[in-house]
């Protein structure tokens, strides 16, 4: 996605390698065709306000008001963690072993620029010629669709990708479409591309679409519709901006979480039984500062949280990752939550299990090595 598009999206609020053995090998797998949904939360999600370390006594010291609101959640996870109260559906998935959370993760990006951090998250590192997801899909010979206004960096570098987004234009008549098609008689490639666009439009204008253009719930529902069935894409990508909470964090995140929670439910419902063969990966570019600021918010940080959802998780219903602690000498650069594991390693592990492929080979593809 180009920087200008990304900046526009950010302003809106509405739309080393770890190996696991027995838990991964013993988890039940499906024989059906697997689907993948990659969800990027743009703006730097506060992981500590998402999966809340209520057991850490330093939380209230660093966040006197934010921690009070967050620790009021009754959505309990294991090891003393809490899930934010605005994520009730995800909590039910957790209890059903359809959600995994990973705390204190980082991509390896070393600064705090949204745009560079998002590029790093999508490339799979620095200065890549293709996106990490595009490389992984090429290895699997899979196709993808991005529910975005243009092809995001994650999916650049593969020919088996298209993008779709609700049109600003009013619906046109069939005669209009036929007239446009006739203009492409001498260019079969353009004619085919136009036909595919019309087919996508028809697929996504069925009953149940929300009235508000770009609304995440509607986009997630459309994503599920575009993935469904033998003719659907193998992978979809969604984006949701609005996570840059420098002020009034609690009410803003409450609204954001509600939108995310409802959107993912819409995705699951649209996929139906195919949810059992779906892996949803939810990540952000970096986290927030450990200390709250003077405007009831947080600033750009380092480690955040990573979420996996779906019907075929190897370790569903778990909080994974190592908690680094919140004492002064445990903070990264004296201000941030310290990353204790790498985002791309976790993604590679989950994708390797989901696709039943070699984790080391996949990790090299994801990292562009």
Question: What are these language model-derived features?
Answer:
Residues 264, 271-294, 300:
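Metal-dependent active-site segment of extracytoplasmic phospho-/sulfohydrolases and closely related
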Residues 104, 296-297:
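Mature extracellular/periplasmic domains of secretome proteins
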Residues 2-270, 291, 308-369:
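Feature for exported/extracytoplasmic and membrane-associated proteins, marking the mature portion
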Residues 233-235, 283, 301-304:
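Active-site lining segments that contact anionic ligands and/or coordinate catalytic metals
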């Amino acid at each position: 996605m180009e920087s200008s598009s990304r900046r526009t999206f950010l302003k809106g609020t509405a739309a080393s390698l770890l190996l696991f053995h027995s838990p991964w090998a013993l988890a039940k797998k499906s024989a059906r065709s697997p689907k993948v949904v990659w969800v990027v939360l743009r703006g730097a999600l506060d992981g500590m306000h998402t999966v809340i370390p209520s057991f850490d006594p330093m939380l209230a010291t660093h966040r006197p008001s934010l921690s009070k609101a967050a620790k009021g959640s009754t959505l309990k996870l294991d090891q003393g963690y809490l899930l934010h109260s605005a994520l009730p559906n995800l909590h039910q998935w957790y209890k059903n072993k359809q959600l995994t959370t990973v705390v204190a993760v980082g991509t390896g990006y070393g600064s705090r620029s949204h745009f560079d951090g998002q590029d790093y998250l999508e490339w799979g590192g620095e200065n890549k010629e293709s996106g990490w997801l595009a490389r992984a899909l090429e290895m699997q010979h899979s196709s993808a669709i991005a529910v975005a206004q243009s092809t995001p960096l994650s999916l650049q570098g593969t020919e088996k990708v298209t993008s779709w987004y609700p049109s600003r234009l009013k619906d046109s008549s069939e005669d209009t479409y036929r007239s446009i098609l006739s203009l492409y008689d001498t260019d079969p490639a353009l004619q085919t591309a136009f036909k595919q666009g019309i087919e996508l439009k028809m697929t996504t204008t069925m009953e149940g679409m929300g009235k508000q253009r770009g609304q995440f719930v509607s986009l997630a529902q459309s994503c599920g519709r575009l993935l469904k069935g033998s003719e659907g894409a193998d992978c979809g990508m969604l984006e949701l901006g609005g996570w840059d909470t420098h002020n009034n964090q609690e009410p803003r995140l409450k609204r954001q979480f509600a939108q995310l929670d409802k959107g993912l439910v819409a995705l699951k419902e649209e996929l139906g039984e195919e949810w059992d063969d779906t892996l949803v990966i939810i990540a952000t570019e970096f986290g927030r500062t450990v200390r709250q600021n003077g405007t009831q918010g947080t600033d750009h940080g380092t480690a955040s949280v990573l979420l996996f959802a779906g019907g075929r998780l190897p370790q569903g219903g778990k909080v994974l990752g190592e908690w680094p602690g919140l004492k002064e000498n445990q903070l990264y650069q004296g201000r941030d939550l310290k990353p204790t594991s790498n985002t791309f390693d976790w993604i590679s592990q989950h994708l390797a299990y989901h696709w039943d492929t070699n984790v080391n080979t996949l990790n090299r593809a994801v990292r562009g090595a």
